[in-house]
């Protein structure tokens, strides 16, 4: 049987309303702060309503994948920390965190946000790896959209570290004036259909 809060949510949804007072298509308040980490190539803190996440971008040089010898690599990871909710445990990322990271990875990758061809240093040998690490600080719902927004904001402010081709070494103490090559910025929106009502999360 449905619990009382679920029944109330469904009842309000049929009227285009919800428990927190927002209308069906009304977003949570979104706040974005960038440049929160001195050690990351780019970083952001995002609040979507009471949900808060932080994201950082780090880069290093590695080998390309065999099926894309002239393109850089993207790796997204996410941790749902016990700090953010009692539902989460210490230890390796759980299924929920892995799934959210996979969805953010797909959103960034399939939207063509990063021009990965411009991350190639030497075809078939060396490319830039772009790591996006995301951590939940408070989970009050819709961590997925908050994580996606934080990832995009961190990428948008990221500058590439310098790479010494002779020494084949990245100099993390000095930033170049090159930003991570980006295309048009994607926007991730989660919505649900409850009865006949479409609701923004």
Where do the protein language model's features map onto the residues?
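Polyanion-binding surfaces on beta-sheet-dominated domains and ring/shell assemblies
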Residues: 1-201
């Amino acid at each position: 049987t449905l619990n009382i809060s679920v029944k109330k949510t469904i009842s309000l949804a049929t009227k285009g309303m919800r428990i927190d007072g927002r209308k069906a298509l009304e977003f949570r308040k979104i706040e974005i702060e960038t440049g929160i980490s001195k050690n990351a190539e780019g970083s952001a803190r995002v609040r979507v309503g009471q949900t808060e996440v932080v994201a950082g971008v780090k880069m290093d040089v590695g080998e390309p994948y065999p099926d894309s010898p002239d393109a850089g690599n993207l790796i997204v990871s996410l941790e749902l920390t016990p700090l953010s909710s009692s539902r989460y445990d210490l230890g390796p990322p759980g299924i929920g965190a892995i799934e959210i990271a996979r969805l953010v990875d797909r959103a960034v990758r399939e939207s063509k946000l990063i021009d990965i061809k411009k991350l190639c240093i030497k075809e078939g040998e060396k490319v830039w790896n772009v790591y996006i690490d995301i951590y939940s600080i408070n989970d009050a719902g819709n961590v997925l959209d908050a994580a996606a927004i934080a990832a995009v904001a961190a990428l948008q402010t990221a500058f590439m570290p310098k790479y010494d081709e002779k020494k084949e070494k990245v100099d993390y103490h000095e930033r170049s004036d090159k930003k991570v090559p980006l295309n048009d910025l994607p926007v991730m929106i989660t919505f649900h259909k409850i009865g006949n009502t479409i609701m923004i999360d």
